[in-house]
């Protein structure tokens, strides 16, 4: 192994250790023709870290969807700066606002779920008292328990939109862009909450240009101030929305696995690809389109 190869493997292992300490799953680095590479998985998808070796030295590259929260967090860990900066990233929690979040956008199987929750100063305290925090810090069992508590809180105003894979595929074909679909769904959830309770602000996690949400908002929605920020789950209403969305997503898997006697894996891993091949070959393409988001690269491998 050359000196450049040795420095490259040392470099990628150092990065992977740092990434794992932040709670992400990583694969073991493998050697390709000109680089060492490893996969990184998060809740909203997967990306790849590559460290190239040549006579000129080493080059680090992060490969994947730049709009994924996973990509932005890992980019920050490696390069020490945020890929996207936003004046809204330092906003304080408003007195009353709507928080939105989604679950399932990085998973081949399952629905895309978007939830919106209204809160004010007093209700924020109630949400915190029942354990509301970022759903990524909670087990599936805890998510189910806290989601139930959120729904039972007196005066809780929320909306959950679960887009089944079959409906998702129709909408994606129509819109041709995941961010447009996300924008439409977030806007719909915000509008549904506004029909029950007026609010002047809304906060969502940053997944793309604000225009994707604004362009889909109706009359009431266009009057609010929208903040799209990274790590938006630090805001209580967004954290509550993330729990409701994740709970709906998990329940879909429990229901479908029981009804169809399938153990559908989450994410977009090799296991997912193997299960998708089984479904297509044994149950048919019509069944697959009712269970999976077909625009994923996984479909092309089947």
Q: Where is each model-derived feature located?
A:
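RNase H-like, Mg2+-dependent phosphodiesterase core
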Residues: 1-98, 102-302
């Amino acid at each position: 192994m050359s000196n450049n190869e040795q420095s490259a493997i040392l470099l990628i292992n150092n990065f992977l250790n740092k990434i794992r300490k932040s709670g992400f799953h990583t694969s073991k680095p493998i050697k390709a023709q000109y680089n060492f590479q490893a996969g990184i998985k998060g809740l909203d998808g997967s990306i790849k870290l590559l460290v190239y070796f040549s006579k000129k030295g080493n080059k680090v590259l992060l490969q994947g969807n730049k709009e994924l929260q996973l990509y932005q967090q890992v980019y920050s860990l490696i390069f020490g700066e945020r890929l996207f900066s936003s004046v809204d990233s330092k906003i304080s929690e408003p007195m009353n606002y709507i928080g939105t979040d989604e679950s399932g956008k990085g998973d081949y199987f399952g629905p895309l779920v978007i939830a919106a929750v209204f809160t004010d100063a007093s209700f924020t305290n109630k949400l915190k008292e029942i354990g509301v925090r970022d759903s990524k810090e909670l087990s599936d069992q805890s998510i189910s328990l806290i989601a139930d508590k959120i729904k039972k809180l007196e005066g809780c105003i929320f909306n959950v939109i679960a887009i089944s894979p079959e409906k998702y595929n129709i909408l994606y074909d129509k819109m041709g862009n995941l961010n447009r679909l996300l924008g439409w769904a977030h806007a719909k959830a915000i509008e549904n909450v506004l029909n029950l309770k007026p609010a002047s602000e809304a906060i969502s996690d940053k997944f793309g240009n604000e225009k994707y949400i604004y362009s889909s908002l109706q009359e009431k929605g266009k009057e609010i101030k929208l903040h799209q920020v990274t790590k938006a789950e630090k805001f209580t209403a967004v954290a509550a929305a993330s729990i409701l969305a994740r709970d709906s997503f998990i329940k879909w898997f429990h229901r479908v696995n029981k009804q169809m006697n399938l153990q559908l894996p989450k994410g977009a891993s090799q296991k997912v690809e193997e299960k998708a091949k089984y479904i297509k070959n044994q149950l048919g393409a019509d069944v697959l389109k009712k269970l999976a988001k077909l625009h994923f690269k996984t479909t092309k491998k089947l």
